[in-house]
């Protein structure tokens, strides 16, 4: 049901049809052994997160819906999971800036603003703030979507990512 509501949202449809974005669900498939893919397989996320990545490397938009399995306190999404989702969204947003289209997190700062409640739809919006060779700086916000009400800002993050020069990341990443 949450996924049906998501794909019906005008903003989702607009992103899906926008040629400036790549649309993907990177954690789908049995071969993916990542942390988030395991959460999807164990139904801790209602659906596999949707990623919309600007081809220009300017940022990304990510949608997801956590279940109560991801609560730290009653009905509050665990902060570690929130930071993981912010890290992934920030990373995917800057990857188009790197020749290999891959990189690693060097620094990630998260500020929690309001409780992120379980069983709600969330959107992360990221923006690349600076690109310098194999280095990228980015920021993003986690928003709780509440139907026709204004979104609630739950967390903010900023990150610094690099494309390593001597590490062939493709050997370390399953596609």
From Swiss-Prot:
Keyword Transmembrane helix (UniProt): no
Alphabetically ordered keywords of this record: Cytoplasm, Nucleus
Primary location class: cytoplasm
A single MF term (Gene Ontology): fatty acyl-CoA hydrolase activity
Keyword Transmembrane helix appears in the UniProt entry: no
BP GO terms, sorted: fatty acid biosynthetic process; long-chain fatty-acyl-CoA biosynthetic process
Name listed for the protein in its UniProt record: Uncharacterized protein C26H8.11c
Origin species: Schizosaccharomyces pombe (strain 972 / ATCC 24843)
Lineage, opening ranks: Eukaryota, Fungi, Dikarya, Ascomycota, Taphrinomycotina
């Amino acid at each position: 049901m949450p996924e049906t509501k998501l794909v019906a949202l005008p903003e989702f449809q607009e992103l899906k049809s926008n040629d400036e974005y790549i649309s993907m669900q990177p954690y789908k498939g049995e071969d993916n052994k990542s942390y988030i893919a395991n959460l999807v397989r164990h139904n801790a996320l209602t659906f596999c997160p949707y990623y919309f990545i600007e081809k220009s490397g300017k940022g990304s938009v990510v949608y997801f819906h956590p279940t109560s399995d991801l609560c730290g306190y009653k009905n509050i999404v665990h902060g570690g999971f929130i930071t993981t989702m912010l890290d992934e969204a920030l990373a995917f947003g800057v990857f188009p800036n790197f020749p290999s289209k891959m990189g690693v997190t060097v620094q990630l700062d998260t500020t929690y603003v309001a409780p992120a409640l379980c069983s709600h739809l969330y959107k992360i919006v990221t923006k690349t703030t600076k690109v310098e060779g194999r280095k990228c700086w980015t920021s993003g916000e986690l928003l709780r979507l509440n139907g026709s009400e204004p979104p609630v800002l739950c967390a903010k993050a900023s990150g610094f990512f690099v494309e390593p020069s001597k590490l062939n990341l493709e050997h370390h990443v399953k596609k």
